Amino acid sequence: FGKLFEKKECAICGGEIGLLGNRKLEDGNCCKNCAAKLSPWFSDRRQSTVEEIKEQLAYREANQEKVAAFRVTRTLGEGMKVLLDEDDGRFMVTSARNWQEANPDVLSFSDVTGCKLDIDESKTEIQYKDAEGKRQSFSPRRYAFSYDFYIVINVNNPYFNEIRFKLNGSSVDNDEETLLDGPNAQPCVRGGGLRTGGAGPIRPGMPGGSRPGARPFMGGSRTSNADEVRSSMEYRQYEEMGREIRDALLQVREQVRNEAVAAAAPKTALTCPFCGATTTPDASGCCEFCGGAVNG
């Protein structure tokens, strides 16, 4: 136990590391305070050397200047938000209310290499309690489905290549109860209320519930509520939110790349309509001799 309680020194800042504050590196130790300054999207700390961590912390310190200059022109998402600075061609992803202090990574639109919406589906078997209180399965088996919505942004960055975050705070499942009081018990939502007409409960802050007129879950010979959940307003809200984020990032990435291609295209000599000189227009599309607008 001697080495366990042996005092360790942070290879980054030189400070003493407390008993539960050590964060292992490939060739040294790092205190929790230094580790907390790393990018939240970085996951290879244990495989990183002391020098690599120092380089990243320098990058993170420089990032604070980008955060200070960031001006939000568009906000996408709820808890975890994608903030766009469309004037400067940059974005960040953060859940912090005071993001200026949180120092989220500021990335350029051109850093985006891909973006997709991932919808994870899970299912839980619906069971009932028999006369002895034991769990029993229905025949055929019945299942309640739930869904979680994730955005995955692929990026060019020296310290991480993926930003993945969840859109919904809790799983979208129409609040189905998965353990019934008996084989003939009425389907209920969690909390005890009977489910009638398939209209799901409205969560706090949600604009509505399931599709009006949907069939009650497990009615007749049905063994799944997947269709009802996927047609609920909550499901559609997060699906639309994910598509909006995905489309926005792919659109600005395409715009930046088209501009880069246009800027790199060979310049064509034109005759200036004002001075008659043969000129190659400058970046503003003006004659290099008289300054007249040659392009448009």
Residue ranges of predicted features:
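Short Cys/His-rich micro-motifs in 6-15 aa windows
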Residues: 30-44, 290-296
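Residues immediately within or flanking Cys/His clusters that coordinate Zn2+
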Residues: 5-10, 28, 269, 284
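Short linker/helix segments within small regulatory modules
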Residues: 20-29, 280-286
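Acidic, Ser/Thr- and proline-rich intrinsically disordered linker/docking segments
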Residues: 115-266
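Anionic N-terminal interaction surfaces
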Residues: 38-105
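Short recognition patches in nucleic-acid-associated and regulatory proteins
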Residues: 4-24
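Short cysteine-rich clusters marking metal-coordination/redox-active sites
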Residues: 10-13, 31-34, 272-275, 287-290
